[in-house]
Amino acid sequence: MTINASNIENSFSKINSHFSKLTDYIWPIKRHEISKFLFITLLMFCILFIQNLIRALKDSIVTTMIGAETISFLKFWGVMPSAFLITVIYVKLVNRMKAENIFYLIISIFLTFFALFAYVIFPNHEMLHLRPVTVHNLTASLPNLKWFILLLSKWSFSLFYIIAELWPNVVFALLFWQFVNNITTVEESKRFYPLFGLLSQTGIYLAGHFLENLSNINYYVTNKFALQSSFHTLSIQIILTIVLILGIVSIKTFWLLNHKVLDKKHMALLRFKTKNKSITIAKSFQMILSSRHIRLIATLLICYGIAINLVEGPWKAAATKIYKTPTEYAAFIGSYLSYTGVFTIFFVLLGSNIVRRMGWFTSAVITPSIVFITGILFFAVNNFEGFAGLIIANFILTDPALVAITIGAIQNVLSKSSKYTLFDSTKEMAYVPLEPEIKISGKAAADVIGTKLGKSGSAFLQSLIFIILPSASYQSISICLMIIFILTCVTWIWATKELNKEYKNSIKFSQK
């Protein structure tokens, strides 16, 4: 039997070809792009790690040291106006400073505040805040302003919450993505961005794992250096020290990207410019009212924001029954973040196959279905803790309150994971068959109105209830929130079904 050398050569070339395709699929980064990709990834990792640490810390401080009910007030009356203010400031900075210097300035302001909070403000918060007797007298004389008084009396905690909430919008969404979008070509983005998504979830998982082990780290540092500071003060200082270190690494990485990694071609693209034809709130409403397709997409965004916030408030309030200190609460949030990272990676890997095999509607309806089913389970146990919680607890031999917290955590993990993948991808797909003008302005309109109304609408609704009923708590209004939640989810599923019809019609129309 003779062996043909040309056949062997062809076989090897086919194997090499298949192996090359597999390698390109797993690692699509070209050799000359590796340094650029790795530095951008490092910058993204640092920013997201900080984001997840301060997100957990702000909730830990506010829920355990002021009250979970105040979060809705902070979101509507604190975060929203601050976001508008910083947008105005940013626009003015863009017209007066270099893009690189804007990044350094804004990051430095955030890091300076975090350093002051860790080493000056929090260790002395009892001296800086109003005395409990004064707060009690004020709330007794002005009961309808109770929650505003509590927030102002513990002003440093409120300020920390607002600053921490601004980080993802200002540093990640604005500074990071505007920089990356400017230095990345369209061809590069197709290969870079999917990997960014996977790596960002790795950051969530690691941040969560760090917070889970915060108590152990605290004990180690205390024993190693014979520190005398309070346990919870040290926990906050450990978290914010990591934040400061990663912040400095971010600044250095950004400097290296600008001065060592990027070539002149990429640097020529790097300009932060404000668009003269930015869409206003009034124009957004006009666009939504004129197009049913865009109106339905905006409805999905509004319903998501309302539904998630309606569950998060009572869930965080329930968690404070078990996790009563900032350290304990941060460890609990860390566990939740770890699972969110794992499940999001799972949905990322599964998402494209679901869309391809089962179609747009099935993929789009998964998120509202998950939110609805898990949300109803949470409210059922939370509202009827003595009945439903006791039945479940008898089977799994645990505290009924812990059952509600666990179901709430599962609800949040699955909801956020499916939102980051299936919901976001199907929402973006819904724009594709539209005419170019509607696609561009319609997306801006839906994102502006849908996102803002979803987040702020739920916060305003909850804060209004607490103003009218100052003695109310999340536990006492939970049934009311459950009814609103059910109506919101039903509307969400209906809007998804109707958008599916519009989506199919738009595809048919675009193919004519």
From Swiss-Prot:
Q: State the membrane topology.
A: Multi-pass membrane protein
List, alphabetically, the InterPro entries matched.
ADP_ATP_car_bac_type
Q: In the record, what terms sit under GO molecular function?
A: ATP binding; ATP:ADP antiporter activity
Any one cellular-component term (Gene Ontology):
plasma membrane
Indicate the principal place this protein occupies in or around the cell. Answer: membrane
Q: What compartments host this protein?
A: Cell membrane
What sections of the protein cross the membrane?
Answer: 34-54, 71-91, 102-122, 157-177, 192-212, 231-251, 296-316, 330-350, 361-381, 390-410, 476-496
Q: Name one Pfam family in it.
A: TLC
Domain of life (superkingdom): Bacteria
Record bears the keyword Transmembrane:
yes
What GO biological process terms are annotated to this protein in UniProt?
nucleobase-containing compound transport
What keywords tag this UniProt record? Answer: ATP-binding, Cell membrane, Membrane, Nucleotide-binding, Transmembrane, Transmembrane helix, Transport
Concerning its family, UniProt says: Belongs to the ADP/ATP translocase tlc family.
Q: What does this protein do?
A: Provides the rickettsial cell with host ATP in exchange for rickettsial ADP. This is an obligate exchange system. This energy acquiring activity is an important component of rickettsial parasitism.
Q: What is this protein called?
A: ADP,ATP carrier protein 4
What organism does the record attribute this protein to? Rickettsia prowazekii (strain Madrid E)
